[in-house]
């Protein structure tokens, strides 16, 4: 999803994931009206633009957060945290706090937190924008692999045409409050 700065892309993601209520209309995800469901009931993972790390949580606690909220058993949480840490290349960082992570590490942890509850839809708000070119390429490859291996549909906000060409199957623009598909 592309569009001018300030056109409402982030607001749209927040409405889809349930952090804001729409003024009118409905939110349909996977043929299901989720407009009035709580965020945790929508089957959506969300990676905000800034990563939104909890400053006093270790990487291990960040990755297990969604499962703790859902009152999952400790052994299930520990297993899922280990799976995600290995898959995302952050196993060696599990006991670190966010302030001791690089930008790329923070993005991997934010992605892991969003994937913890095994969502069917992943919302990504400019996850590559603050990274250098090499890290951007690495994380783009990781995002593609995660989508493919987990069968996840992703809605990815970007300002970069190159990024959309690399990651997108379909490119949309938010223009005048309407989402429109762009021609190939």
Locate the predicted segments by residue.
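Catalytic Walker B motif of ABC-type/P-loop ATPase nucleotide-binding domains
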Residues: 122-126
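Helix-to-loop junction immediately C-terminal to a conserved catalytic motif
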Residues: 17
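Conserved ABC ATPase signature
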Residues: 97-101, 105
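Conserved H-loop
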Residues: 151-157
């Amino acid at each position: 999803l592309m569009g001018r700065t300030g056109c409402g892309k982030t607001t749209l993601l927040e409405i889809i994931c349930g952090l804001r209520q729409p003024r009118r209309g409905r939110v349909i995800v996977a043929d299901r009206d989720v407009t009035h469901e709580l965020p945790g009931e929508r089957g959506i993972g969300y990676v905000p633009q800034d990563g939104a790390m909890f400053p006093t949580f270790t990487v291990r606690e960040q990755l297990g957060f969604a499962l703790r909220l859902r009152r999952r058993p400790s052994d299930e949480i520990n297993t899922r945290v280990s799976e995600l840490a290995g898959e995302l290349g952050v196993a060696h960082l599990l006991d670190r706090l966010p302030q001791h992570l690089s930008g790329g590490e923070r993005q991997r942890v934010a992605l892991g937190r969003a994937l913890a509850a095994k969502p069917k839809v992943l919302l990504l708000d400019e996850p590559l924008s603050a990274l250098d070119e090499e890290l951007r390429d690495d994380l783009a490859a990781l995002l593609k692999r995660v989508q493919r291996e987990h069968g996840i549909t992703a809605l990815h906000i970007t300002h970069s045409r190159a990024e959309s060409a690399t990651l997108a199957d379909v490119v949309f623009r938010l223009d005048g409050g309407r989402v429109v598909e762009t021609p190939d």
